Amino acid sequence: MALTATATTRGGSALPNSCLQTPKFQSLQKPTFISSFPTNKKTKPRTKHISAVQSPPSTTKWNLESWKTKPAFQLPDYPDKVELESVLKTLSTYPPIVFAGEARNLEEKLGEAALGNAFLLQGGDCAESFKEFSANNIRDTFRVMLQMGVVLMFGGQMPVIKVGRMAGQFAKPRSDPFEEKDGVKLPSYRGDNVNGDAFDEKSRIPDPHRMVRAYTQSVATLNLLRAFASGGYAAMQRVNQWNLDFTDQSEQGDRYRELAHRVDEAMGFMTAAGLTVDHTIMTTTDFWTSHECLLLPYEQALTREDSTSGLYYDCSAHMIWVGERTRQLDGAHVEFLRGIANPLGIKVSHKMDPDELVKLIDILNPQNKPGRITVITRMGADNMRVKLPHLIRAVRGAGQIVTWVSDPMHGNTTKAPCGLKTRSFDSIRAELRAFFDVHEQEGSYPGGVHLEMTGQNVTECVGGSRTITYNDLSSRYHTHCDPRLNASQALELAFAIAERLRRRRLGPKFSL
């Protein structure tokens, strides 16, 4: 399990040896993976090395600092390098936030999604903040993901892998290193773990001590998530209690109550048949964490050698991904990521060349291990129908196994007449429809969805059944970065996806 694990092992030791060793600045041999990964009847993973594409960046020896020899983008310029090194040295002595075994478990689950046997639900804030850090916010986002998980599992009749953009999603890439207002030019806001969002010189100076605060907030967030996941809150018997107050009297709330009632009836049948509903699988849930691998000094400081496998894991999260702006084949971020054993995501827009994607996957997953690579597409509905088929064919032609996931958020950001950034629910849904259509056309598997969302009753994305208009945006617009789906919109989207998963299972009777 992931967040159902406790702080003690069965043998009673305080912490597992795995992932507790401090970083060693030495060369790491290429990892050797031995896998007996389960497959379905349709697809058998190749385990031999792909020789069709070989890229020079992966031929050099990897170590924890080899990324520093590569071109680095989107990294802040800290004015006090001595202070920076002091903070990083301190962070490198701190306990890991997650354990290597949990990351391996997630990789196995994602391998199932790559073969069409599971579905990834990845969601959370665009960017976590120090100001909005509270137990209620964490609980509400976790709760709506539980609801969405039930809806998707019921529709798809397959396991749902729940991964939060939580407990570490602070840093944000910027299109411009500087921001200008009224003739004043200051460094751009890069996330609370780098600098402050207030538009003044002091706030915008990168402060390395913010990394320590981000670490402690991530630890606290994960601690609460572990408690929710294993302490009874996530038990299926509570399926009727997960509705948020503001979604209760809505169409989505009504649909969810109907589904929850059906789940209750099924559990009642299980009890009557003598099957226990008190089993761990019914009273707990697996929940993993993820964030963009952007602030490399922080990621390096939290990377540990796993004593059970000898591999290096970035113990800041179970899964991390490389963004559109930092996925250069010869870049620092790709160099860092190729040496760690976590499951990895690759954000892909309509600009991605199919051959480049094949090369990037080969650098990051030379052993072609299922679950290692998740390709997260973000390109808008029209581009999705044109570009995605070529990417799928190129990856399949190279014999590579990946989990295909749709991020319908980032390709649909627009500016409202009032000047606020927003996203249209109809556009988000259209991109998801295109994603499923293309995979149906290509005979590949739609493996998951990646959403920027919150459990709060915000008004940041327009549309949905409880229609939010441009005029409504300013009433509860709280995001520090990009607009997020609120709980009602997220649940509505989950029902639409569930119907499409059901269509794949039963035939073309439903439409997204």
UniProtKB/Swiss-Prot annotation:
Annotated cofactor note: Binds 1 divalent metal cation per subunit that could be manganese.
Cofactor: Mn(2+)
Annotated GO CC locations: chloroplast
TM annotation in the entry: none
Binding site for Mn(2+): C126, H410, E452, D482
Name of a matching Pfam family: DAHP_synth_2
Spans annotated as Disordered: 37-57
Recorded catalytic activity of this chain's protein: D-erythrose 4-phosphate + phosphoenolpyruvate + H2O = 7-phospho-2-dehydro-3-deoxy-D-arabino-heptonate + phosphate
GO biological process: amino acid biosynthetic process; aromatic amino acid family biosynthetic process; chorismate biosynthetic process
EC number(s) per entry: 2.5.1.54
Principal location class: plastid
Organs and tissues of expression: Mostly expressed in leaves and stems, and, to a lower extent, in roots, stigmas, anthers, petal tubes, petal limbs and sepals.
Cellular compartments annotated: Plastid, Chloroplast
Pathway(s) per entry: Metabolic intermediate biosynthesis; chorismate biosynthesis; chorismate from D-erythrose 4-phosphate and phosphoenolpyruvate: step 1/7
Key words, A-Z: Amino-acid biosynthesis, Aromatic amino acid biosynthesis, Chloroplast, Manganese, Metal-binding, Plastid, Transferase, Transit peptide
Transit peptide start-stop: 1-57
Disruption phenotype: Normal floral volatile benzenoids and phenylpropanoids (FVBP) emission.
GO molecular function: 3-deoxy-7-phosphoheptulonate synthase activity; metal ion binding
Binding-site positions, substrate: R165, E324, R325, K347, R378
Subunit structure: Homodimer.
Function as written in the Swiss-Prot or TrEMBL entry: Involved in the production of volatile organic compounds (VOCs). Catalyzes an aldol-like condensation reaction between phosphoenolpyruvate (PEP) and D-erythrose 4-phosphate (E4P) to generate 3-deoxy-D-arabino-heptulosonate 7-phosphate (DAH7P) and inorganic phosphate.
NCBIfam families: DAHP_synth_II
Name of this chain's protein: Phospho-2-dehydro-3-deoxyheptonate aldolase 2, chloroplastic
Organism (species): Petunia hybrida
This protein's encoding gene: DAHP2
